[in-house]
């Protein structure tokens, strides 16, 4: 498939042939869902913790004698039945991550790129270079109509562009190796540089 290549000032800079294997697939929601779930679960801290009966510090004294009171039998006030007592089978720190094969992760990335291409939310620019002035880049981004955009560059992100984009709300920048399904789907517009297209095609072929 062919797509126009533009400059940051909005001018045309030719066109580019995109691989059908990367940008021409029929997007599958089940594949995208599995990869996003894998990403988010691996990112989850899993630090939730409550105290069990052995960890609470209240009292270890038996609250009253075993027999003769007419009440139920009880030990100390650390029991889960009492206020300030320990929690029975509560959450403990653990990893929420699970495995997903490299082959499937690559497939998910191809489907994410294809989803953006099919939705008309894919833009290819000649390069992502700037002098480091936020105001100038913000004006260009506004003129291009990018409200929530992810810019993916080649192997390395241009320092001036990264510095200029740092304070622009809704604009994220990643090198080609940082391209991932969650960040691609999270933004309304996916912007690829020509070097990013080449790097992604080499990575996902």
Swiss-Prot record:
Q: Which GO terms describe its biological process?
A: translation
Q: Can the keyword Lyase be found in this entry's annotation?
A: no
* Record GO terms (molecular function): rRNA binding; structural constituent of ribosome
Domain of life where this protein originates:
Bacteria
Q: Which GO terms describe its cellular component?
A: ribonucleoprotein complex; ribosome
What InterPro entries does its record include?
Answer: Ribosomal_uL4, Ribosomal_uL4-like, Ribosomal_uL4_dom_sf
User: Any idea which UniProt keywords this protein has?
Assistant: Ribonucleoprotein, Ribosomal protein, RNA-binding, rRNA-binding
Which Pfam families does the UniProt entry name for this protein?
Answer: Ribosomal_L4 (PF00573)
Function recorded in the entry: One of the primary rRNA binding proteins, this protein initially binds near the 5'-end of the 23S rRNA. It is important during the early stages of 50S assembly. It makes multiple contacts with different domains of the 23S rRNA in the assembled 50S subunit and ribosome.
Q: How does it assemble?
A: Part of the 50S ribosomal subunit.
What family name appears in the similarity comment? Belongs to the universal ribosomal protein uL4 family.
* This protein's name: Large ribosomal subunit protein uL4
The gene is rplD
């Amino acid at each position: 498939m062919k797509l126009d290549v533009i400059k940051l000032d909005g001018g045309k800079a030719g066109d580019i042939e995109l691989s059908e294997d990367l940008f021409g697939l029929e997007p599958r929601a089940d594949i995208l869902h599995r990869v996003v779930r894998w990403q988010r679960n691996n990112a989850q801290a899993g630090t939730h913790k409550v105290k069990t009966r052995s960890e609470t510090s209240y009292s270890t004294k038996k609250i009253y004698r075993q027999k003769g009171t007419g009440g139920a039998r009880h030990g100390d006030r650390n029991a889960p039945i009492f206020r300030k007592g320990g929690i029975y089978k509560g959450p403990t720190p653990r990893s929420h991550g699970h495995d997903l094969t490299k082959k499937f992760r690559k497939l998910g990335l191809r489907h994410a790129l294809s989803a953006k291409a099919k939705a008309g939310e894919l833009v290819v620019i000649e390069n992502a270079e700037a002098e480091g002035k936020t105001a100038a880049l913000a004006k260009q981004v506004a003129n291009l109509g990018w409200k929530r955009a992810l810019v993916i560059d080649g192997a390395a992100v241009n320092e001036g562009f990264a510095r200029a984009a740092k304070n622009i709300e809704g604009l994220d920048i990643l090198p080609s190796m940082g391209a991932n399904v969650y960040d691609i789907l999270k933004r309304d517009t996916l912007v690829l540089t020509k070097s990013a297209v080449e790097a992604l095609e080499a990575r996902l072929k």
